[in-house]
Structure formats: structure tokens, C-alpha cells
Amino acid sequence: MRKTTISLVFLLLTLTAWCQQANYAKMSSMVRQLAMETTGRMRRMPSAGDRELCAFVRIEGNADSLLALYGGRSLARFGNLHVASIPLRSLSPLSLRPEVSRIEARQGNSIQMDTTLVLLGGAKAHAGELLPQAFTGRGVVVGVQDIGFDLTHPNFYDTSLSEYRIKRMWDFLSLDTLGSDLYVGAEYTTEEALKTYAHSRDAHIISHGTHTLGCAAGSGYDTSYRGMAPGSDICLVSNAVTEDISLIDSADVYKYTYALDALGFKYIFDYAKSVGKPCVVSFSEGSMMDFRGDDALYYEMLDSLVGPGRIIVASAGNAGHQVAHVVKPVGMESARVALISGGSSGYFSVKTTSDDYMLDFVLYGPDNARQTYLLRPVDIYLRSDSLLTDTLEVGGKPYYITATRYPSYYNAAEEVVEVIVGTDKRLGLDYYAGVDLKGENVELEMFRGGGYLVPEDESLGSSAYSIHSPSSAPAVICTGATGYRTQYVNYKGDLHVYNKGSNGERSDYSSVGPTFDGRVKPDVMAPGTNIISSYSSYYLEACPDASDIESDVEHFEFNGRTYAWNSNSGTSMSTPVAAGAIALWLEADPTLSRDDVMEVIRQTSRRYDESLEYPNNFYGYGEIDAYKGLLYILGLSDIKEISDHQPAAVRFSLSEDGRLCLGFPHPYAKPVMVRVFATSGTEVMSTQVLPEGGMAAVDLGALPRGVYAIQVCASDQALTGSTLIRR
């Protein structure tokens, strides 16, 4: 009876709302648009309001009862902040409730691969140069929220193939929903269930997650292409982004928002908590920042999710080689910017503290037809809801211009005008489209939203403010990409060259800061250009002629299927590399918080260009150094006798009975000093060895079990350095 009563109240409330205004000021732009569209559609078709939106909502008081009155429910709660499912018909009436102060949702994530080319193999990350012997991520959960997972790839076993390391997965797009308590999709929680399911639903159209997971936690199988934390446990969330949206039923499309991604992060952390292990989550997705504050509650939720032993790492974005910011200074009468998009529309924002300016559009059509369109801020202000929409025809070619204005979320003294320019075909490519920023007495800042900005005066443009969200969030560790190798040979024997920097130089595509509220981002860098990792056998099977298959470096058979190792580039790759390094640190200290990790990064990162001040908006604090970070966490970095780097040309192995073997370049046969330090800093052994046949051995069998630093000193600098071993 109670359920029936609530349903009747819900119907009455939503029907009454047709005659009321919504409080649009409480809504993010997507929620506002959905509320307005739904009100109109419901007049024609009442069932249009039945679809659900997954949103962030701030509610004071009894949120469960309030949401139930409007047909909604809370899916997760942190204080007065909820992730909630809300029928579209309820958005307007819910916004009128005094208990509700904000409703927020956003879509538009895309994966962060460098789409210029997809090439090569990142030796620094995956040939073991950063990997200490004593720490492999054991006892740590590495979470990856991504798309396109092949759960059967041997990279996700241990090296002996005796342990399957994926412990569970939530697939947002799974159709196995019968009996599932999850908001969307289904979870797979046993080895048998995971292997039977075999792959995320989208793995036949994309392999992104298979690659990023390998970067973070792959064992390498029988190759050197291992991830940073090959001993870790794995928990996955296969979410939904632009690239796999075609698999979503149109009735459910508004369930797949950033709020649902937040539930994905929570799912991974909840699993780690249930098994009593620390966790780092890698997220190689994102979208452009905005001035509307549409991610404000998202950032609060992320801040609530992280803590001691709970870290989120996200990709900076791959827009660093594009103009994202144009400045027309005071004293300059105008600055022309071409507008280009591979699609039919593009959008940009203009920010300033004055209304004393104009946007003068110059649009072309067939037969050299030309037309201008003058847009002043006051024109927008005079329209209802501060929304201007206009259409033009230039030589038979249609254009439409939509503009809105609002105060910047980050500084209310600054006004933002947001403009969408659209046409019937590719904007600015078939016929020129541009805008003159006019106003001699005012500085105008123009920001890229969608499409591309090409200033006539190149000196006015830069890649500043190109960092993506959610890596722009204060609680998230934002990772940019560096380059090392510049060429590779694919599985066909073809040589490919892709030079995006060497020796740890920032790859030009890696997005740069600051954030719109002025914070330095990225936080850290990691190898991201030309990284070799695992690729989906199901994608290879379904799309054998896809362009990215050309960057496969090897195909091999395992359990009757053909798998691949593939080269890829982007901050999508650097992010899991950084996350895997942090997993090693969490193994050393499971209580590390985000601030603790940032302090390790600040103290130990490698700085490519010492002439720069750090942190900066290109490199953050520098490139992550997993080994040097471990020395810092273990308290060994201040012991001058211990090098802060591993010997480049020495390989170590340790037998169960404590015999430490050192491999040297043959035929090196000069004396080598080996010193052994406990983590207390005490030297517990010192001996000199003479390599024979490129090998030498030291017996550590008498030492107690534990972690030790091994310092090797030789006349050859490549043979000098330290490593960590676990006795």
C-alpha cells in the first residue's frame, strides 16, 4: 500500500510541475537541457519522462524519502552528496524543493590515445628498467576503469600461468542483468565466471582497456612487455564512453554519465576494502574542462572516494599540440581565429570582465559567397534564459549560431560567452569559417571546446588550459606523457617511425595546464609514447583490417586463440604506468594518501629540463621514478652510500635459499664491490666479487627475511647503482 501511495504522490507532483517553472540555477547545463526538452516532449508523449538520469544531487534532510517521492533513488551517498537515479520527468519539480541545492550530470568522456599515430614500444616502462626486484604490487589492488577488456589474455595471469589475477569486473554494458542488483550491467566475481564471460561486451570493437591494463599490471607472459605492478590483484570496471555508445539502448543512454563513473570508482575501492588491501585506480578517459562548474559535485565525490590507501590517477589528455587558448590583449583592435571541425559543428568560450567587445563572424559558402554576423554580449542578455539562437544562409550553405552567457563558476566577476557554430558539413574545411575578437580596450580570452582554433596571428595562441577532466580535479593525480623510443618494427616486418620526444622529453600531444581555477596540472609525467602492451584477441578476430592492428608488434597463440602485443601512444598509456608505479609504493606503505603520494612525487621525480621551475604546467613535478620513490618511502634516500638509481647494465635474481646472482655484460671481468643495507640504513654485509662469464654471486642466506638494498660499485658507471631485493 505504501508503494502505491508514493506512486500516486509522485504522479501528482510531476503533473503539477508542468504548470511550474524549474529552478534552472540549481542544474548543470546537461540537466537543464534535459529538463527543458522533457517538459516539451511530455506534452506530446507522457512516457518521454520515464527515462532515468544518473546524476549527482546535493540534498539536505531525508534524501531517500524525497527521492522516492519523485520516483528516484539514491545509489551512493557521502554526507549530503548523492549519486542518484532520477526520472527525467522529475528533474524540474525536484529542483524546486528547498532541500535540493544542486543537480549535476555530464557526458562526453573519450579515451585518451594519441590519434596522430599509434606506434612503437616503451622500453623504459616495460623492459624492467623502473622495476625493483622486491616490489611487484603484491598485496595491492590495481583498478582500471576503461573499455575493451579481453579477460583471457595471458598477460593477466602471473608469469607461471598458475594464478589468474583478475578478481572481479563490473561491465556497465553487460546484458546479463537477470538477478543483478547493480544499476546497470552485471558483475563477474569468480575466476570461472570471468573466464566464461571472456571479454567486456565492447571488446569486439575496441581494445583500449586490454592495453592500459597491461601497462599497469600485466605480467608480460613470456615477453619483456610487463606492466609496472605484475604481482598485483586486478579489479575492473568496463564503463561506457563516446567510442562504445552505440551499444547502449537509447532508453538508457542518460544512465551513462560521470555519476555512473563515480560509482565505478566506488565499486573498485569497495572491493579492495572487502579484501583488506590498498588500491590505486587508473582512468584513461576524460573530456574538456568547462567554466559552468558542471563537474563541481563530481570533484567533491572524487574527494570523498580517495584517502589513505585509495588513490585515483587519470590522464591529462592529448590536446597539448593543439591551440586551446587564444588571447587578444588590450590595445589590439581585433584578432581573427579560424574555426575548424571534422564534424558539422564546433564550440568555444570567450571570457572577460567587460561587455565592451564584439564577436564578428566571417562565414563563406559556395561561389565565394560571404556573410558576416555580429554578436554582442548584450544580444544574448536580452534573450530568454540568456540563450541566443540564429540561422544564416551563405550562398545556399546553412549556418547556425547558438550562444549563451553566464558568470564563470571560478570567478563571478568574469563573464563567459559560450558559442556553438554549426553547418551542414565539415565546419571550416569545405568553406572558411572564422570569428574576429573585437574590443580594443579589453582583454579577451578564447578557449577551445569542440573542434579546433587557428589564430591568424600564431603568437596569440597556445596549448594552455588543455588539461582534461576529471584529471583536473584536486583529488586526482593528473598524468602527462613522455617519450623514449622513436621507431618500431610491426608484426609484418614494417619499420614505423614516430618521434614524440626521447630521453623523457614531454610528448607534444600531452595536455598542459593550468586548470580553469589556476592550479598547476599535470601533477606528474610517465612514459606514454610508443608503449607495447596486450591487445584483445576478440578485437583482432572481429577487426583484422583495422588501422591500429598495423601497430601490432607480435601475434601469438594461447589456448587456441590468437593474441597480440600492440604499440600505442597517449596519456592513456602514461596513466596506467604511473598508477602501476604507485601500486609499488602502496606495497611498501599501504596507508599512503593522495597528499603522501604527491610528496613522494615532489621529492623524487626526474626533471627533464632543469632550467624550468617545478612544478610547472608542462611537466608537473617531473617524470615519476618508481625506484627512487621506493627508496624515499623506505627511508633510504638519505643514505649517501646507496645510489638513487638502478645499475643500467646489471641484472639481479635471488634464489629461495638466498643466493643473489648478478649478471654483467660479457666479458666484464673487473672487481665489483657489493654492499648490502637493511631498511634501517645499517650496512649488514660487504663483499667484493669478480665476475666470471658475465656472472657473479653473493650468498645472503644468513640474513633474516626482509627487504634489503643492494649497492653495486664498479669502474663502469653503467654497472654502478642500487636495487631492492626481498630475502
Where are these regions (language model features)?
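C-terminal subdomain of the subtilisin-like protease fold in secreted/lumenal serine endopeptidases
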Residues: 43-46, 247, 274, 278-287, ...
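N-terminal domain-start motif of subtilase-like serine proteases
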Residues: 27-47, 90, 111-162, 192-208, ...
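Autoinhibitory N-terminal propeptides
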Residues: 17-133, 141, 158, 243, ...
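Hydrolase catalytic cores
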Residues: 213, 235-242, 269-279, 309, ...
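Short, surface-exposed loop/turn motifs with a glycine/proline- and acidic-biased composition
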Residues: 688-716
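C-terminal tail/sorting-segment detector
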Residues: 19, 682, 705-727
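Subtilisin-like serine protease catalytic core
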Residues: 129-259, 276-280, 307-309, 323-324, ...
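Active-site core segment of subtilase-fold serine proteases
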Residues: 149-210, 227-229, 275, 366-449, ...
